């Protein structure tokens, strides 16, 4: 089949494709200090999250240093402990806002050398109560133990359990359950 010159014009003529894009690029953080975050790539979001957590950790009086290499199995060393950092803004909902405590914590691995994992879910741009900026942590040992539970809140990603990939995530309603787990701690317990 030969692609006709007007083919690209024809498939866009009814507006469906263009309208779909417009409906899915809304930024619920517009007008806040997080404006534009949703349009960044995964790498840029990761760097931003690490910078954000570093500033929070320093403000709490903890010592923090970068990982020894960019390929280390952790992002920072906090109080001498290799620490993985996961940061997310609350996920967009269908009304143009966000769903509280619904975020994505992904690319967690059993085989990496982190000892603690800090995760942050930003629910509102300017916090008025402690959990508006939800900040929690858990240990690598607790993560590995929880993975063995039949009702684990973490799921395999990129190939699933049958793919044998050591890559896990927690998202949506499972994040809301995760924050209530006994092994998950607040930053004041760091």
Model features per residue range: what roles?
Residues 1-81, 86-190:
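Nucleic-acid endonuclease domains
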